[in-house]
């Protein structure tokens, strides 16, 4: 009598590569005709956004954009004036076993953003961003169990082990909107910069949903 063990599967992911790189970004900004000449730069602020994450054969390509705001004192002295530009960048990682069926997650940190005045009508932006990526591929987890129709006099040696599996690699884009009351604001007030910081307080799984609070 032939007895075959029953093989069971559970879909999961496994990490096949992770790496961190520092990307150098540079771009020039020409002062528009509607703006005054630059006397002195007082503030440079940079915020990033991830545009795409592409996984191809043997590599992961992360594309993003750095939004730079520059606040400067014009040659006339007052009032303060601003310049802004969007600088695209990309960072490529070699992941030997990656293919188009894999998924990648990325994190970006702005290390530094500096402004150099080339002349009163032109500045150079030099920035460094740290790009981190992790690449995951599908990996079915399997185990064997005794068949339901096994004879009563058949005995099976069993063992157990704890396994922690990655069950999902996904992302979601959402928008936020809120009002901020400001005092001592008049018609001549200028909005100079709007840095934003996101903080996560908790992440809980409820049924098939991941609830993130922050």
Model-derived features: where do they sit?
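Viral structural modules
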Residues: 1-214
């Amino acid at each position: 009598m032939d007895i075959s063990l029953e093989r069971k599967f559970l879909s999961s992911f496994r990490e096949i590569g992770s790496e961190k790189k520092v990307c150098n970004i540079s771009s020039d900004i020409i002062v528009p005709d509607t703006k005054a000449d630059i006397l002195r730069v007082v503030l440079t602020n940079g915020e990033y956004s991830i545009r795409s994450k592409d996984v191809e054969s043997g590599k992961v390509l992360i594309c993003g954009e750095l939004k730079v705001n520059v606040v400067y004192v014009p040659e006339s002295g007052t009032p303060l004036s601003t310049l802004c530009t969007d600088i695209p960048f990309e960072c490529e990682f070699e992941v030997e076993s990656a293919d188009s069926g894999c998924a990648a997650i990325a994190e970006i940190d702005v290390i530094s953003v500096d402004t150099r005045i080339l002349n009163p009508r032109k500045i150079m932006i030099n920035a460094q961003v740290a790009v981190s990526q992790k690449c995951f591929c599908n990996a079915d987890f399997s185990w064997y169990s005794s068949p339901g129709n096994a004879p009563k006099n058949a005995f099976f040696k069993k063992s157990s082990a704890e396994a922690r599996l990655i069950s999902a690699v996904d992302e979601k884009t959402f928008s936020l909107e809120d009002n901020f009351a400001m005092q001592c604001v008049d018609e001549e007030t200028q909005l100079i910069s709007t840095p934003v910081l996101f903080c996560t307080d908790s992440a809980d799984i409820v049924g098939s949903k991941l609830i993130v609070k922050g």
